[in-house]
Amino acid sequence: MALLEVSGINVFYGRVQALRGVSLSINAGEIVALIGSNGAGKTTTLRTISGLNHATTGRVVFDGRDISAAPAHDTVRAGIGHAPEGRRLFPRMIVLDNLMMGTYSRKDRQGIPSDIARVYELFPRLKERTKQLAGTLSGGEQQMLAIGRALMARPKLLMLDEPSLGLAPILCETIFRVLTEINAQGTPILLVEQNATKALDVAHRAYVLETGSIVQTGTGKELLSSPDVQRAYLGM
């Protein structure tokens, strides 16, 4: 059974339909990318999975449980970590306190120090800035902090929305290197990313979303070599 199974979800904003029968799945150990142009429905898909939006029809099943109507705080407790577009940090709190905000749903408080150490191992720059206000960090450091905060919940699935947006190429490389490391340590990842080449390069599988509908799916390598994908998203 897939860890996450999204089946035929339809989502509306008022009278505007944002998602049209979207279906996708994620298995244990996978990185799955969701690519598409701006306004295609990628962020809405993540928000619907995490309980920030709700589908009018269709189902979202996570770890064997139907979470279609679950509020966001329940999906966090179920094991879904979501690092949203725009990072959504607490700018007047220090780095360490932002990380601690990711632990609010945890019952195993004893494991928190080791998980903070793990985040600092993944992102040494955060350790150097542990007492610095989040609002004074660079864009790349803020993205590291957003990912680290999501990891502090010990998610069974990590969802990332545009992790490389606005970052310099060298920081983009760092973020993607760490994502593959997180995945290699056992955490599945659902990745929405405007840099389609990088996303498909690290993804085991991927979906292409256009105007709210899935129009193509395959392995990352298959979509990298697809003429349609190359023309529309890879600038070839």
Where are these regions (language model features)?
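Glycine-rich phosphate-binding loops of nucleotide-dependent enzymes
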Residues: A2-M236
